[in-house]
C-alpha cells in the first residue's frame, strides 16, 4: 500500500515538475520520495537553486514560509497546512512590541525557526 502511494507521488511530482523537500524528522516513507532532505534552513537555501517552479515542503509552517522568503519566485506548497511547531508558535507578537517599546535602543533577534510574522517584527 505505501509503495503504491509512493509510486503515485513520484509520478505526480515528475508530471507536475515539483521538487519535494523533506525535513529530517519526516518518516521514512516521505523521506524516500523526497528530492532533498535536511534541516529547515538548508532546505530553504536549496529551494533557491532547484529548477522546479513548485516546491512541496514536508515540514511545518515556518519552514514553508522560509522557503518562500528565500525563493519568492517559487510556488511553495506545504504538505500539511495545519502542521505547526509549538516552539515556534509560542511567541506572542504583543510581547515583541512591548519589549521594543520598553527598550527602544535594543535589537530584537529572532531565530530562523520562527514564524515570519514574528521575524518581521524583530
Segment roles from a protein language model:
Residues 1-66, 70, 79-94, 98-109, ...:
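Metallocofactor- and cofactor-centric catalytic cores in central/energy metabolism, strongly enriched
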Residues 73-74:
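A short alpha->loop->secondary-structure connector
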Residues 118-122:
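Conserved small/polar residues in nucleotide/adenosyl-binding loops
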Amino acid at each position: 500500500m505505501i509503495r503504491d502511494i509512493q509510486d503515485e507521488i513520484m509520478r505526480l511530482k515528475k508530471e507536475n515538475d515539483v521538487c519535494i523537500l523533506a525535513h529530517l524528522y519526516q518518516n521514512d516513507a516521505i523521506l524516500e520520495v523526497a528530492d532533498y532532505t535536511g534541516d529547515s534552513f538548508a532546505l530553504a537555501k536549496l529551494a533557491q537553486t532547484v529548477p522546479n517552479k513548485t516546491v512541496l515542503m514536508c515540514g511545518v509552517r515556518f519552514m514553508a514560509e522560509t522557503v518562500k522568503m528565500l525563493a519568492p519566485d517559487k510556488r511553495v506548497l506545504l504538505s500539511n497546512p495545519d502542521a505547526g511547531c509549538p516552539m515556534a508558535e509560542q511567541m506572542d507578537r504583543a510581547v515583541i512590541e512591548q519589549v521594543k517599546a520598553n527598550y527602544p535602543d535594543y535589537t530584537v533577534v529572532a531565530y530562523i525557526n520562527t514564524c515570519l510574522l514574528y521575524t518581521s517584527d524583530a
